[in-house]
Structure formats: C-alpha cells, structure tokens
Regions:
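Non-catalytic interaction-recognition regions
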Residues: 2-118, 125-616
C-alpha cells in the first residue's frame, strides 16, 4: 500500500537538497528529519501540510530565500515542476498533486489528485493483505512487560501495561523489528519467601490446623484463596510431613513447585487476556545462580560508577520519597546514578551483602544486551518514574551506548461498574483479578479499550459501558463498521455475482473503476477515501512514538465516517452503497467498502482482535 505522506516527504527532501546546493547551504541529516508532512485539519486549506520552509528558514538567512514565504514558494514550485519524476511502483508520471498553495506562516498546503487516491484504494482492494513498510530491518528489541511478582493471579491494575506491551510488540513485529516478548520472573526476592510462608499457612489448614485470617494479617502473608489448591498439592506430595520442619528445611522442598504453579496460573491469566510471551526469564536461575549480578557490577566498577560508601541522610528526610529503606549507617555498595541526573546515588549491595532491586535490573540489562537486543522497551507504572534516569545510565554504560532504553510510563486505570468501584475478589484476597474483568467484558473489549486513551493518561474503565451496543462503546462501533462492510459485500455478491475472494476478479473490478472518484462526489465518500489513504502514516507515527493508541483512535474515526455514510444512504437512496440500476457507481462504492473492510481488519490484527463479520 502506498504511503503518500512518506512519498511526498522524500520528494520534499530531494527538492530542498537541490535548492540548498544552488544557494551554497549545507543541510545535515537531522535538518532533513525535523520537518513534517501531515494531514490538514481544516480541509478548506487542502489535504496535506508541510512545514519544511519554517524548519529550515534559518539555514537560508544569508541567501535570497531569506523569507519563509519565498523559501516555501521556491520549494512548492520545484515540487510541482518535478512531480512527474516521483517514482511510485517503479513508475513515473503519477501526478500526486492537484493543487498547491502557501499559507502566511509558511506552510506548504497540498490538495491530492484523484488519480493518486484512486491508486491507493485500488491497491488495497487488489492485494491479498495490506503490507506494512519495513521500518525495523530486523533490529532486535527486547520488550519486557506484564511481569508482576509471581505471588498471585494477575491484578486488574497490571492489565494496562500488559496490553500496551503486547499490542506494541505486535506492531513492531509487523513493521520488521525482531521482537522478543519477555516475562521477567521476579523469583529471587523477599516476596517469594512471603509466598512460601503463605502457602505453608494454607498447607497447615489443609492438614487440619486452625489458621485464622488474622494470622495472615499479623505476619503480612498473602490472604488469597488461590493458594489453597497449591497447598493441597503439597499435601498430596508430602502428606503432613512438612508440619514439623523449619523454614530452612521446608523452603527448598516446596520452592520450585510453588513458583512453577504460580507461573502457570499467571500464564493462564495472560493467555485469557490474549498474551503469550516468547521467553520467561527467571531472575534466580539466570542472574543469581549464574553470578550475573557481580559480573555487571564489575563492568560498572571499571567505569568508576560503583563505590563503597554511605548515603548521607535517609532519603525520606530530604522529601525524595519513601526509599529510606536504602539508608544504613554502615557502608554500602553504591551506583553513581547522580552522574545521569538522579537525585542521589543508589544502593546496589546492602550492608548485609544482599542485592537491591537495582542490582538485579543492572544484571538483567546486561543479559538483554548479551543476547543481542539493541532496544530495551519496558512499560512500567507511573510509580516507577524515578527509575528512568538511573536505569538509562546503566544501559548506556553497560552497552557503551550501543543499546537504547525506552521506558514507557502507564497511568493507573480505575475500574468501575454502574458508577461504583469494582469490588475486590474473595479468591484474590485484597484485589480485583484480571480474570474477573475478562469474564465480564471479554478480552477483545479489554484489549481495545485499554488503548483508547494515551498510556500516560489516567482514566475510568466503566464495565457497564463496555458491554453496550452503542457508539459510546469503541470496540463495538469499530466491529459494527466491519460487519456492515461484510453485509454490503455479501449482498453485492448475491446480486451481481461478484466473487470478492477471487484476486483476478477484484483486479478486473478495480481496472474498470480506476477513476471511480469521478463517480463518487459526496463529501463524506471523498473524506473517507482520504482517511483510508492515511493508514500507513498512522502506522508509522505509532511506531515512531511507541503509541499504539493512535491506531485505536484512527479505527474509531474510520468507523464513525463509515456509519455516517451508511446513515446518509438510509435517508437518500442515491447514496446507498448498492444501486441496482447504476452498476458504475455501485462498483465504485464496493471498491471503497472493500478497501475500508481490509483496513479495519488490518488495524484490529495489531490488537490481536478478530474482525466480526456479523453482529450478534
């Protein structure tokens, strides 16, 4: 599928390089990246706007083109003069531009020619599947997401970052990146010891001992009933033989069984959410048992970024946060995170020789790089905002600036139903599980709705709205548009005997109607065609900024425009998609509907959502 925006951008680059050469102006590669080619909101000004003259005017300050409008006019005239040289599908003479004008601010405004829009629609109809541009060139990405501590079922609060990470991984794979979807198993910290104690308390209950709810509260144990089946497994394996053992004795006996069961529970929850990782990385086995933490710290030590010393005062006394647990009057091993903009240096090895979370993360970053990753992507909650600078410094140092860290911060989601907060689960103990929400609204709705807001924006997820069949329910609205497209094409197939699954017949249909824009003169039809032509730009912007929510927004806009056209046809018979006694305009509209159907299906595939052919 042709991306008209990137095609035009390359044309602007070609022309400005010629102009710069003629005026002895040097342009850097960064200069040629800084300008935009994007849709115009106010359609009376055209279809596409370019700000290249505005971004480069300073470079031309000592030339005869030292005024932004003069420079814009020079660029525009070159574009028009040479547009027949723009190569599309290895061919020239595609006249892309119908009209070009200059706004006072220096924007170059372009109205697209019907011919190029015809080509875009025909191309979508004729290909078996829309092919995305290769933006990644097989660059390796480690995308670690949905990695809560393996101490219970997936919390509903984890769903936003988990879905964001999974959809982003799909998108990056589709544009040519080599993405490893990884789950980091936090199985080496204090929380695992708490888990083992919690399971043992349930095991004691299974053995007939009276363990009250207050016992769980008193000793800070996990109170959820989800631990009972694991406790019963222990009883099957050990009978009551564990009861008289100390922690040091029973921990090694039950650890693997308990952790493995918890991971299987989490995998099942994630699978219900539509998520399946490529790799499950154990902190204990891969970092602690293989001595990777000391290896990573030694690398930082050689860069003079590790030293033994004291934190001057507890951080809480400085008002920096609640991290005063890192303070100790004794010497500790510290990372010089202040060199990378952090508030204070951070502890990696405590006075008692135990590692901090940061120490594990340092070793994990080294492991990612050693396994070939060049970009590390980590969706995290906003409460991890302070972690960004220190970890970014770690990655730059460990990889000698050969790898890039991208931490995506996701805001909290408040789940409500009928304007009331969702009640906590007895099974989970003190939180709402993701499985409960999935069972109520379905994974498709949850996956799509989670990306109907930008990831750094808090929002209320209303379960009662998600099951409504109305335009207020985004996934229903998009699926309904796809189902309506299927309905139109099914009716056309029955009436006109058109086989929409036959590539040859589709090519013939497009060939006959290559100038169908001449037949479609309703403003809504024209705008829908232009919006379809914007699809690959939306994909590229979503990849560039790691923002898959842009695709959700785009699909909603497409659906809204299509439903508006449908309603026009209900009011005006001349605007129906199928007019039996006007085969030309019917074929033209069928091409439009078929192209729209493909774009919606292609967009939903990124979310791992199957498009609906009919609404039930």
């Amino acid at each position: 599928m042709l991306n008209i925006f990137s095609t035009l951008k390359q044309s602007f680059i070609n022309e400005i390089q010629v102009i710069a050469s003629q005026h002895n102006v040097e342009l850097t590669s960064q200069d040629l990246k800084n300008f935009t080619v994007e849709p115009i909101k106010d359609k009376k000004n055209g279809d596409i706007a370019c700000n290249i003259a505005m971004t480069l005017i300073k470079k031309f300050s000592n030339t005869s083109l030292n005024n932004v409008e003069l420079l814009a006019n020079e660029i525009a005239s070159k574009i028009i003069q040479n547009q027949d040289q723009i190569i599309i599908d290895n061919q020239k003479n595609y006249l892309i531009i119908k009209q070009i004008s200059i706004a006072k601010a220096g924007f170059i405004n372009i109205s697209l020619s019907p011919k190029i829009l015809n080509k875009i629609i025909a191309e979508i109809v004729c290909v078996e599947k829309i092919i995305f541009p290769n933006l990644g060139n097989s660059l390796k990405i480690n995308l670690e997401y949905a990695s809560p501590n393996p101490t219970g079922p997936i919390h509903v609060g984890h769903t936003r970052g988990s879905i964001y990470g999974d959809v982003l991984a799909n998108l990056l794979k589709m544009v040519g990146f080599d993405v490893l979807k990884e789950y980091y198993i936090n199985d080496a910290g204090e929380q695992i010891l708490t888990l083992l104690r919690s399971v043992f308390a349930r095991y004691q209950q299974v053995c007939g001992l009276e363990i009250t709810d207050n016992y769980f509260v008193k000793f800070g144990l996990y109170p959820g009933e989800y631990l009972i089946p694991i406790a019963k497994k222990l009883f099957v394996s050990f009978s009551d033989k564990l009861l008289n053992l100390s922690e040091d004795q029973y921990f090694p006996l039950i650890r693997n069984l308990v952790v493995e069961d918890m991971i299987e529970m989490i995998k099942a929850d994630l699978f219900a959410l539509g998520i399946k990782h490529d790799s499950y990385f154990s902190e204990k086995k891969e970092l602690h048992d293989k001595n990777k933490i000391h290896e990573a710290i030694e690398i930082l030590k050689k860069q003079d970024l590790i030293y033994v010393g004291k934190l001057s005062v507890p951080m809480s006394d400085k008002g920096v946060g609640k991290s005063s647990e890192e303070y100790d009057e004794l010497d500790q091993t510290l990372f010089r995170s202040t060199k990378f903009g952090d508030d204070i240096d951070r502890v990696v090895i405590k006075a008692d020789s135990t590692f901090t979370y940061l120490a594990g993360d340092i070793a994990y970053a080294l492991s990612k790089f050693q396994r070939g990753a060049k970009i590390f992507i980590m969706p995290l909650g906003y409460d991890h905002a302070g972690y960004v600078k220190r970890l970014d410094g770690v990655v730059k140092t460990l990889t000698n600036n050969q790898a890039e860290l991208k931490i995506i911060l996701c805001q909290m989601v408040k789940f409500v139903k009928d304007n009331k907060p969702l009640k906590m689960s007895k099974r989970a103990g003190n939180f709402i599980t993701a499985r409960e929400v999935i069972d109520e609204v379905g994974s498709d709705a949850l996956r799509f709705l989670m990306l109907c807001r930008k990831n750094d924006t808090p929002f209320d997820f209303d379960l009662s709205k998600v099951v409504e069949q109305s335009k207020d329910n985004p996934i229903f609205y998009v699926q309904y548009a796809h189902a309506r497209c299927c309905s139109v094409l099914k009716n056309a197939q029955e009436i006109f005997k058109i086989n929409f699954s036959d590539p040859v017949e589709l090519k013939n249909l497009c060939k006959k109607n290559i100038d169908f824009l001449d037949k479609l003169n309703d403003e809504g039809e024209i705008e829908l065609i232009k919006k379809i032509a914007n699809f690959l730009r939306v994909i590229e912007m979503s990849v560039q900024y790691f923002e898959p929510h842009r695709i959700a927004f785009y699909l909603q806009e497409l659906a809204s425009d299509f439903h508006a056209l449908w309603n026009k046809g209900s009011e005006n018979p001349h605007l129906k998609f199928i007019i039996k006694d006007n085969i030309d305009i019917t074929n033209a509209r069928l091409c439009l509907v078929f192209a729209l159907k493909k774009v919606i299906a292609s967009g939903l595939e990124i979310f791992s959502i199957k498009p609906s052919e009919e609404m039930k």
